[in-house]
């Protein structure tokens, strides 16, 4: 399959106009979704003065079967803001006594570690890497209040906190750390790696730049008037939340009413069917807070993408993905060494879990070469 991939290197980037126009800013988020080892079931998390107990499941509740080739552990670790994150650690069973390269994995935006990131983590562990799939702050089994809120700053920090944790494991060579970001966490991964020089290589799969789509809409179609109106509405919502003492939430995601764009149908097919449904996922019929877009509106996370160089970037996207332009723009903005790999015929969601579409051989080869 990988010989059929369309790979783009410097001076060969191809621009592509998106088919989606006129997305209003307030709807951009809704359109998108459509560690210390702890054997105990709970662990304390001090999150902004709120002492939470993380309720960690002990049964296998992933959307994919457990591989006989890996060892799995539930773990927790704290980020720099004192939020305790829950994660799944995967180790190759035939690892021997050598310290191994490691990969930290996050995403998609609104998903949990039991979904796509866990599948990537387990598959890469089968190929000889120690891997960690984590729930971002405020979501899944991780700590933080209020629930289901996102932040480009805190969620970027989540990646570096995961690097902190995995680097201290006795099975890991801390000089050989990589990162994979999926969907909206692809942009977060690039932002984290730009500032975190401990990471030696980064891969994004079916990437979104969440700050771009929330501030400008799909294909940058939002006007200044629309943006201003949205910010005014979000400001009014802040007053309502302050008056009630609790945040309001958007309508449940990925419930189809008919007439939706194909990519929204694709989201539903993953998040709301047995294929990928998970009750803790924001995208599986839950929702983000109404004011979640605020922190994304004026904080462009790819500003310093050039500073990832001289460490290599591999950007992977589906040929038919509505989001393809995010990877193409990131590729154009990044410095060498960089590679854009287009998967023929693949949609955005295909790269969440379709083993016949995700180029795991290429991903493993990339990290084998650069870690």
From Swiss-Prot:
InterPro entries documented for this protein: AB_hydrolase_fold (IPR029058), Polyketide_trans_af380 (IPR051411), RMMBL (IPR011108), Xaa-Pro-like_dom (IPR000383)
Gene3D superfamilies tied to this protein: 1.10.10.800, alpha/beta hydrolase (3.40.50.1820)
Record GO terms (molecular function): hydrolase activity
SUPFAM superfamilies: alpha/beta-Hydrolases (SSF53474)
Protein origin, superkingdom: Bacteria
Family the entry assigns: To E.coli YcjY.
Protein name listed in UniProt: Uncharacterized protein PA2218
Lineage: Bacteria, Pseudomonadati, Pseudomonadota, Gammaproteobacteria, Pseudomonadales
């Amino acid at each position: 399959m990988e010989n059929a991939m369309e790979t783009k290197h410097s001076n060969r980037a191809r621009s592509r106009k998106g088919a989606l126009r006129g997305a209003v800013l307030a709807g951009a988020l809704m359109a998108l979704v459509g560690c210390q080892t702890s054997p105990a079931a709970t662990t304390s998390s001090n999150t902004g003065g709120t002492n939470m107990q993380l309720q960690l499941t002990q049964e296998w509740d992933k959307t994919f079967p457990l591989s006989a080739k890996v060892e799995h552990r539930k773990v927790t670790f704290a980020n720099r803001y004192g939020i305790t994150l829950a994660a799944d650690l995967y180790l190759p069973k035939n690892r021997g006594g050598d310290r191994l390269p490691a990969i930290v994995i996050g995403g998609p935006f609104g998903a949990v570690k039991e979904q796509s990131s866990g599948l990537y983590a387990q598959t890469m562990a089968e190929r000889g890497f120690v891997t960690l799939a984590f729930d971002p702050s405020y979501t899944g089994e991780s700590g933080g209040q209020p629930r289901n809120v996102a932040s480009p700053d805190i969620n970027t920090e989540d990646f570096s906190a995961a690097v902190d944790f995995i680097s201290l494991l006795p099975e890991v060579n801390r000089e050989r750390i990589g990162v994979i970001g999926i969907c909206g966490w692809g942009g977060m991964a690039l932002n984290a790696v730009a500032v975190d020089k401990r990471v030696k290589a980064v891969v994004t799969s079916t990437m979104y730049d969440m700050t771009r789509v929330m501030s400008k809409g799909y294909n940058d179609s939002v006007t200044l008037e629309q943006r201003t109106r949205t910010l005014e509405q979000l400001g009014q919502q802040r007053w309502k939340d302050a008056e009630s003492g609790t945040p309001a939430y958007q309508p449940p995601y990925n419930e189809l009413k008919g007439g939706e764009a194909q990519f929204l149908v694709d989201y539903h097919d993953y998040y709301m069917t047995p294929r990928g449904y998970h009750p803790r996922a924001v995208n599986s019929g839950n929702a983000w807070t109404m004011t979640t877009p605020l922190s994304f509106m004026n904080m462009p996370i790819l500003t310093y993408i050039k500073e990832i160089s001289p460490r290599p970037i591999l950007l992977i996207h589906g040929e038919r993905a509505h989001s393809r332009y995010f990877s193409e723009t990131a590729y154009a903005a990044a410095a060498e060494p960089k590679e854009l790999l287009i998967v023929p015929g693949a949609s955005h969601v295909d790269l969440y879990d379709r083993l016949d579409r995700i180029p795991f051989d290429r991903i493993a080869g990339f990290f084998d070469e650069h870690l």
